[in-house]
Swiss-Prot record:
It comes from Anaeromyxobacter dehalogenans (strain 2CP-1 / ATCC BAA-258). GO terms for cellular component: cytosol. It comes from the Bacteria. Pathway: Carbohydrate biosynthesis; gluconeogenesis. Monomer. Mn(2+) binds at residues 214, 234, 283. This is Phosphoenolpyruvate carboxykinase [GTP]. CDD domains: PEPCK_GTP. One of its GO terms (biological process) is gluconeogenesis.
Length: 596
């Protein structure tokens, strides 16, 4: 194994000792410390191209862009192989897979043993959050994947900046990753919250291998946030500027493939001249209480790891601009001359493609050319609508928190919670139909509290209690809303146009947060009523709007029955105030049905 003293760019004894220990376990041929420089990026990219890990795209059309296709069994997060390794099973809770920490270290240690023979061990220091922010957390990821090292260079503030922030401290996340033999039978993603450690083996896929993303920024961070009195959430952060120059900020939690990136990069419709939406973040929000008693948020990431299929100039022009240069595309389809394509792109598929498995594909094939969970990794700075406050160490003040799932029935277009506790109840009972972003059945409704079900690093009931406890810490809390862009007619057609027209719902929420919009009180919460939404210039029938905003009492009685099953699953740590909210709503629904 080769590494020279000059190649060790730190004197931090805690870090050096840990890296040596991991090298002894994994037995790489050489150890390389990443510095995050442009020169290094070029060198590692050249190495990846030489090793056929990356394929350069047409540099005229896609400057600085490359293509990667993963092992065909390694295309999504694997929730059944993702473990929370706490001292007791109760600390992990009923919604997480649990493994006893010593057993996990032993089991994975046997797979890591010698897993990097013949390979380079990359030491990837990174900071989540603006590097000078009190929010920031340092992580070190050790990996044998140059693809992972290059992706981390896009997704986080990577290299020297992280070592400078760390100094001589022992407070850093210890992340060990190896693709090993990419065997699904030997694939594990283990989180050790008490040790601030992540071990991931057997997968090169983003959510399993880019350890700063879901693993640190959500699973480990949610545990740290509970202990330290803040929130680590699966939320976009957007900036809305009105024609008068007023800026407001919202955080919104949607499960994977429910339009989070599209909402964060929304372009307001022509009927809203002068409005501007800018992106602070598209996926993760870390929120702390500021000196002014408001909730302030930063985006811990530095790039976008977005779903490609369905992204086009109509649905998300800012995302299309964000991927035009210096982007890594994974598991989309490509042409032999270095162009790319995916389902839902602006133009039809070319006559012939190379599909995501590397096989020839002809137009008219019943197989998907791009994998449904194919991705782009793009630098945030590419986004033409990025907020100038994206690197502000203070973060941005949050006026509204929005929860939203993908429901074809039951949940109306928008609701405002009566109060914080009611808002936590709405978030805790969110449901969404499953997507391709996690392996498993597609189209089944599952409860996904705050869109965090796969990402809570400890017991779910305790997590919901932490949300309730935050109320006493936030003197000036944001308002909480529930939205549903995906309601369908009896014929299966979407009732609401979505995309840029979601601005109409956002404007009402912003006006409510500022205390200047009327609302109608219903048994579910406050709604815009018949005249609250600005619908001018919208080509949608009154009947469709009425159906999208309707509250069907029969559906809600069924919904509350289903919520009861969900709450029973959470067991004895379910906060009593949330059970009470369900009981009170059930009484209101039954009373209203009797009146009818």
């Amino acid at each position: 194994m080769s590494t020279s003293p000059a190649a060790r760019p730190t004197s931090n004894a805690h870090l050096l000792g840990w890296v040596d220990e991991m090298a002894k376990l994994c037995k790489p041929d050489r150890v390389y410390w990443c510095d995050g420089s442009e020169a290094e990026k070029k060198r590692l990219t050249d190495d990846a191209v030489a090793a056929k890990v990356l394929i350069p795209l047409d540099q005229q059309k896609w400057p600085g862009c490359h293509y990667h296709h993963s092992n065909s069994s390694d295309v999504a997060r694997v929730e059944h192989l993702t473990f929370i390794c706490t001292p007791t099973k109760e600390q992990a809770g009923p919604t997480n897979n649990w493994m006893e920490p010593k057993e996990a270290y032993r089991k994975l240690g046997a797979i890591f043993d010698g897993s990097m023979k013949g390979r380079t061990m990359y030491v990837v220091p990174y900071v989540m959050g603006p590097s000078t922010s009190p929010f920031a957390k340092v992580g070190i990821e050790i990996t044998d994947s140059v693809y992972v090292a290059l992706n981390m260079g896009i997704m986080a503030r990577m290299g020297k900046v992280a070592l400078d922030r760390l100094g001589d401290s022992d407070e850093f996340n210890r992340g060990l990753h190896s693709v090993a033999d990419c065997n699904p039978e030997r694939r594990f993603i283990c989180h050790f919250p008490q040790d601030n450690t992540i071990w991931s083996v057997g997968s090169g896929y983003g959510g399993n291998a880019l350890l700063g993303k879901k693993c640190l920024a959500l699973r480990i961070a949610s545990y740290l946030a509970k202990n330290e009195g803040w929130l680590a959430e699966h939320m976009l952060i957007l900036e809305a500027e009105s024609p008068t120059g007023e800026k407001q900020y919202v955080a919104a939690a949607f499960p994977s493939a429910c339009g989070k990136t599209n909402f964060a990069m929304m372009i307001p419709p022509a009927a809203f001249p002068g409005w501007k939406i800018r992106t602070v973040g598209d996926d993760i929000s870390w929120m702390r209480v500021g000196e002014d008693g408001r909730l302030w948020a930063v985006n811990p990431e530095n790039g976008y790891f977005g779903v490609a299929p369905g992204t086009n100039r109509k649905t998300n022009p800012n995302a299309m601009d964000s991927v035009r240069k210096d982007t890594i595309f994974t598991n989309v389809a490509r042409t032999p001359d270095g162009d790319i394509w995916w389902e839902g792109m602006d133009h039809e598929a070319p006559a012939e493609l190379i599909d995501w498995k590397g096989q020839p594909w002809k137009k008219g094939s019943t197989e998907k050319a791009a994998h449904p969970n194919s991705r782009f990794t793009a630098p945030a700075k590419n986004n033409p609508a990025i907020s100038p406050l994206v690197d502000d160490p203070k973060g941005v003040p949050i006026s509204a928190i929005i929860f939203g799932g993908r429901r074809s029935t039951t949940v109306p277009l928008v609701l405002e919670a009566f109060n914080w506790t009611h808002g936590v109840y709405l978030g805790s009972t969110m449901g969404s139909e499953t997507t391709a972003a996690a392996t498993g059945q597609v189209g089944v409704v599952r409860r996904d509290p705050m869109a965090m079900l796969p990402f809570i690093g400890y017991d779910c009931g305790s997590y919901l209690q932490h949300w309730l406890d935050m109320q006493s810490r936030i003197p000036n809390p944001p308002k909480i809303f529930l939205v549903n862009w995906f309601r369908k007619s009896a014929e299966g057609k979407f009732l609401w146009p979505g995309y840029g027209d979601n601005m109409r719902v956002l404007k009402w929420m912003l006006d409510r947060a500022a205390g200047r919009a009327p609302a109608k009180e219903t048994l579910l919460g406050y709604t815009p009523g018949d005249s609250g939404l600005d619908l001018h210039g919208l080509d949608v029938s009154k009947d469709a709007i009425a159906a999208a905003t309707q509250i069907d009492l029969g559906e809600w009685e069924q919904e509350l029955e289903s919520q009861s099953e969900w709450f029973e699953k959470l067991g004895k740590t379910l906060p009593r105030p949330l059970a009470l909210q369900r009981e009170l709503l059930l009484e209101r629904v039954r009373a209203a049905r009797k009146v009818k």
